[in-house]
Amino acid sequence: MGIECVGEVEKTTSSNLKKGQKIVSIMGEMGRAFDGSYAEYVLLPNEQVYPVNTSLSWEELATVPETYYTAFGSMGNLQIKENDNILVRVGSSGVGIAFLKLVKAKFPNIRIVASIRKKDIEKRNKILSLGYDEVIFDNNNILETEENFDKILELIGPVSIKDSFSHIKEYRIICATGLLGGKWFLEDFDPTRDIKNNAYLTTFYSGNVSEEKINSMLNYIEKYKIDVKTEKIFSLDEIVEAHKYLDSSSGFGKVIVINK
């Protein structure tokens, strides 16, 4: 497994890459069609190796793809304005937290609300400490609020998308990005009935990637001095522990694995 990695070029057949070049790679069937990034050396197709120019440390850079890339793309597709009222469904997720940091860095006074799926007061307080303005609860994929929003980042997926449409304002946007609800498809979906009239549905897929887009994101992070430090760091021989942590109730945000 391992669908993302950062590192330096050790050897290549590409004239566009040089030994020692700092690179990022995400998606492209890594960890599926061929071995992924859980290794000291990773063999990748040239076309999915993206050279980057950044002053971020290795720990910081490792935190960025694919989480920040997904959040950055979603932010662009949501066409964020400084007076927007935004909802992030599953605000404690890695993408949700990255999205919060990216948006708040540019619009510090914008209102961003997080939803969480368990009534966990400790997690609620931790989320608020990150900079969310309010936390609401998802009760079996139904939001426990009557509030409507200008923009919704939908990270749960098909199991909650119809409920999200009941909370979007007229002429505003939902970006369906995540599948944290564990369901990949939406059955019995009629766009003319299920998409709220005069509202918009878009999406972002992290497989839509290029060197230019990766570096645009990194430039944004450095321009706005965004703190991308991760929640927790594991070494390569602690991958099992890393997955156990993510699966536990204490799992929060994104963790990274470093080859020490």
Predicted segments with their positions:
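N-terminal Rossmann-like NAD(P) cofactor-binding module of classical short-chain dehydrogenase/reductase
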Residues: V24, I152-L153, C175
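Short, well-ordered loop/turn sites that connect or cap secondary structure elements
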Residues: N16-L17, I80, I168
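Glycine-rich phosphate-binding loop and adjacent beta-alpha segment
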Residues: E122-K123, V159-K223, N259-K260
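NAD(P)H dinucleotide-binding glycine-rich loop of Rossmann-like/cofactor-binding domains
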Residues: I26-V90
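C-terminal hydrophobic helical "lid"/dimerization subdomain
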Residues: G73, V209-K260
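A short acidic, Gly/Pro-enriched loop at the edge of an enzyme's catalytic core
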Residues: E144-I152
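Mid-domain Rossmann-like dinucleotide-binding core that forms the NAD(H)/NADP(H) cofactor-binding site
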Residues: A62-N140
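Glycine-rich beta-strand-centered segment in the early N-terminal region that forms part
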Residues: M1-M30
